[in-house]
Amino acid sequence: MSGRPNHYWRYKIIRDPLYGFIGLTRREVKLMNTEWFTRLFRIKQLSHAFLVYPGAVHTRYEHSLGTLYVADRMAVQLGLNDHEREVVRAAALLHDLGQGPFSHLFDEVFKWVDKECDHEHLTKLIIENDETIRSILKGENNNEENDIYSDVLEILTPRKRFYKNKLLADIISGGLDCDKLDYLRRDSYHAGVAYGIFDIERVLNTITKDPRGRLCILKKGKDAVENYRLGRYLMHIQVYRHHTREIADSMFLRAVKLSLYNEKLFEDGITLAEKLTPNKNSIKDFLSFYKQLDDYSIYSLLKNPASRSKELVENLERRKLLKRAVDLDLTSGGEVRDAIDRLTLANMTEEEMDGLSEKIAKRIQEPSEYVIVRRVEIPIKLFKEGEILVYDEDQNLTDDLYRISTVSYTHLTLPTTE
């Protein structure tokens, strides 16, 4: 049972289109007023999906706020104490601080310059090195606020093998976490599609922990979670991997790649690749540069007259997109019949795809920047083993949703025709 009065959690309220009024603590308001957090206003949640779904112009800012709300509902449902509740709320609010321009798309850029770096690592780096955020999390200059800095930092550490409190970490990042529960419904709402709609109230009211302290769903909530999983799968197919969005994203990535090593972009002669590599700069210089990067500033940078990217980016702004010339299905039932050819195409490296683009461009006598070969994968399965646990109170047993679901893809059959 919570010990803090209700007004502590509702120092300020903000209206949200999905959840109505969301209460915030004084500490959370301070965090939202930092430069790093307000930067999220300028980073779209779904990169270039707005070129297909014009309503999908929502940002990481409102998603972070919604994630806090869902995390809090989970914390209360699980009976967390006040300290744990504050930790998961703050971690949920800050979980996307490290996102680059056009969100997850910029993780592709980091793969080219620093394979160890992505938005999750950068979130941790920002919290560790920003004095304002660190001071707020430590509760300095406020006797009413406890120190949650170390605990927030721990559960936001990506892919850590052991967590002091695994339950808190699973609320933030897991098969059924506050991040996914918010973005599926939020993305669906703004895109104007129904694929991501599921019964979130049923899910939140049947979340529990088993006797071993693992995050689970009660057996009676299994149907709602199956609907959530199906919605996630359909959103990837219909929205996140829509071919027009993929084309726009590919044009953006090509524009960045053309400018990465251009020594004329900046007056100091340092390339964009070097500025995006933390271990080649002081952390302070890197974060100072990265803080200024958002959807708008990266476009402005790439339109530098000295860059080969200028025309590509201007075409993106005008929605003059490249067209899909060839689309090959590399599954066993697709157009590529030979198994060896399928395997070769499916396992091409990025360098090999760039080389193929160059060859095609020469053959058809087009500028190489306007020929792009890209492999598109659906990163999730309808169900995945070990992702979501179901707890049966009557039997006191915990099982894997993958094994007991009646709609798991392993059980799907098609009716025979007579």
Residue spans for each PLM region:
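Short alpha-helix carrying the canonical HExxH Zn2+-binding catalytic motif
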Residues: 86-94
